[in-house]
Design a protein with these regions (language model features):
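Non-catalytic substrate-recognition and accessory regions of acyl/acetyltransferase enzymes
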Residues: 1-167
Length: 167
């Protein structure tokens, strides 16, 4: 993965973003909650894709803060400027809030400006112990393989669900 340009991120981001020694992009909110963002290469055989990982390092409940999604979007936009690849995201199941996190994440990307440039889809999958989990994909609309990528995503998640026993 190509390194992200922090100057470009910080030119538009509400929160200052910096790179940690272990390669994670960090930012601290007005509520002193430290977040980490990193990207992990996926092993699928079809396309180059990265898992987008967003972690609340304080493990504290975060109040509604519009600066957080704005900062995350700046990071993701820079990811796509540097890497014409695919982002995958699995919502954390911590606290049983995965459905709410999936809706929130999609709202960020299906709203206003992002909808012009990205396609974001989320699907429910059957996880361990019959737990519902949510996986999302984000692809640039300009990607020449867009329809094929979305078809593979749908096929793979459908196949995954068919292989898992349902409650």
């Amino acid at each position: 993965m190509n390194t992200l340009n922090l100057n470009l991120i910080n030119a538009h981001s509400e929160y200052l973003v910096w790179l940690s020694p272990n390669g994670k992009y960090l930012f601290k909110t007005d509520y002193d909650i430290l977040y980490a963002v990193d990207f992990e290469l996926d092993s699928n055989p079809y396309f180059t894709a990265y898992w987008f990982n967003l972690t609340n390092l304080e493990h504290q409940s975060s109040p509604s803060d519009p600066k957080i999604p704005q900062t995350i979007i700046c990071i993701i936009e820079e990811f796509f400027r540097q890497n014409p690849d695919i982002l995958l995201y699995m919502c954390s199941t911590e606290g049983g809030q995965q459905a709410q996190r999936a809706r929130l994440f999609l709202r960020w990307f299906n709203g206003s400006e992002q909808n012009k440039y990205y396609v974001a889809r989320s699907v429910e999958i059957h996880g361990e112990d019959s737990r519902k989990e949510y996986v999302a994909i984000i692809v640039q609309r300009s990607n020449p393989q867009l329809q094929n990528i979305l078809a593979v995503f749908e096929k793979e998640t459908t196949m995954f669900n068919e292989l898992k026993p349902q409650p």
